[in-house]
Amino acid sequence: MVHLVPSRLEKGFSDKKTFDEWTICIDKFLTLGHSLTQFLITKGLPEDKVVTTFHYVDEYYHNKRPVRLHKNIRVIAMGNQMRNLKLLKTIVDNNPNVNFTICQGVNDLSSYFLKNTNVELIPFVEESELRQHMANADISLNVMEDTVGSNVIVTSLAMGLAMICSNVGSIKDYCDDSNTI
């Protein structure tokens, strides 16, 4: 199962010899998005050796009746791999009447959003606490430089959040004009 964006794989397998050594003994590769499948094929894997599948979402995240009880719109931004932090900062700065919950993961973004009074930064949290933050949000904001199948995307959809996503990588395998801006 390959679950990294192509640029991350390029760092580990920058030359063809290394790539071939690591992949020769593998019968099938499963990817969580078409962009990663295409990348592996362009690196030399036969098409019949690569299978595109989809990211699962745990039933625990299914939110049958999302209820929004707050006055101002609340946006949650999760997932720090390949996040477009510059664009996220611009969006936050340009929307002072919107409340943002930004998941930092293992990074400390406090100096980055120091002047933004509309931002709540949360560190890496357990799933139950993350689910609660998602339940309190109206919108899942996913500004990314690239993506393949993402637990952030599928859990946001399951939670009934409105979706705003960068049109990159394999995002259209999960989100399109019918469910995402």
Locate the predicted segments by residue:
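Short hydrophobic faces within alpha-helices
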Residues: S156-L157, I164
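Conserved catalytic-core segment of nucleotide-activated headgroup transferases in glycan assembly
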Residues: H70-L114
